[in-house]
A protein has these predicted regions:
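Conserved NTP-binding catalytic cores of kinases and kinase-like/nucleotidyltransferase enzymes
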Residues: 2-3, 9-143, 148, 265, ...
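ATP-dependent phospho-/nucleotidyl transfer catalytic cores
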Residues: 88-95, 129-135, 142-252, 260-280
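Prokaryotic Sec-type signal peptides and long signal-anchor helices
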Residues: 7-8, 224
């Protein structure tokens, strides 16, 4: 299974991996933060070692997104959520990470029940980390079947192998999925401009500190202006979509890297679990 194009990757074939810092060092006077950083590095080293896994993979590859560590231990993938809080996402405690691992499992099984295998706890005792039930639960991972590289829709498109037939297969899969989702008044209210603006306004607020660094003031104000203009000019369209029950619990992050298309099967995976309103 691949992660998003933002991922960074490294691999190890045996023994203890050479670590690259994955968290900022804690400032002086913050021993608790430093302890968390040290624990994360030990956990990453454990999960990068092929000897750690019951099925003894030949190698382990680590891919990172901004919110997860993804360990590819063929034929399985183990995904661990980073302990962080970003406003729209909160993985800050072990219990919250357990909850969202379970949500990831449940939500993605709607579209690919054979890929998402279970939530696997990782234990820690005096002897270190283990998948065996020894000591206390230190972390949770989502265990998945690995998807064969070369068949992600982004890769097929780059090779010129996506035509009308392939697009129709994706459409048919999504149509069945949307038809299976029942309208829910509590979800449909999120189709109003007022509710949708919660997410876009939140995004603008979170981007403001980076104006002049990663986005120019003109670009920021232009995007915000046209976003708000679109809401104001299309209110009837938004309300019509609600009346026609078109607001459903969907995927939330549907792009080419999250569609896997072989001659035998189509797999749409990695929907958003950390914020329900992003899927509506």
């Amino acid at each position: 299974m691949a992660s998003s194009g933002q991922a960074r990757e490294r691999s190890t074939s045996s023994g203890r991996a050479r670590l690259r810092k994955c968290s900022r060092a804690a400032p002086p006077g913050a021993p608790q933060a430093q302890d968390q950083t040290d624990s994360q590095e030990r956990l990453i080293a454990f999960l990068e070692s092929p000897e750690s896994y019951p099925h003894s993979p030949a190698e382990v590859r680590l891919m990172q997104t901004h919110i997860s560590w993804v360990f590819i231990a063929s034929p399985f993938v183990f995904k661990v959520k980073k302990p962080m809080e970003l406003g729209f996402l909160d993985f800050s405690t072990l219990e919250k990470r357990r909850h969202f691992c379970q949500r990831e499992l449940e939500l993605n099984r709607r579209l690919c029940p054979d890929i998402y295998l279970g939530v696997v706890p990782i234990y820690e005792s005096a002897s270190g980390f283990s998948f065996n039930a020894e000591g206390e639960i230190a972390e949770y991972s989502v265990k998945m079947r690995q998807l064969q590289s070369g068949w992600f829709l982004s890769q097929l498109l780059a090779k010129g192998l996506v035509g009308e037939k392939e697009i129709k297969r994706v459409i048919c899969c999504l149509h069945r999925f949307y038809e299976s989702e029942k309208p829910d008044p509590e979800i449909e209210v999120w189709g109003t401009p007022e509710k949708l603006k919660i997410s876009t306004d939140e995004n603008f607020v979170q981007v403001e500190p980076f104006i002049g660094r990663t986005i120019s003031p003109v670009a920021f104000e232009t995007i915000r202006h046209f976003t708000n203009q679109f809401y104001a000019g299309n209110e009837e369209l938004f309300l019509e979509r609600i009346k026609e029950h078109r607001i459903l619990d969907c995927h939330g992050d549907l792009h080419l890297d999250h569609i896997h298309l072989t001659p035998e099967a189509i797999t749409i995976f990695d929907c958003i679990e950390f914020n329900d309103r992003f899927r509506f």
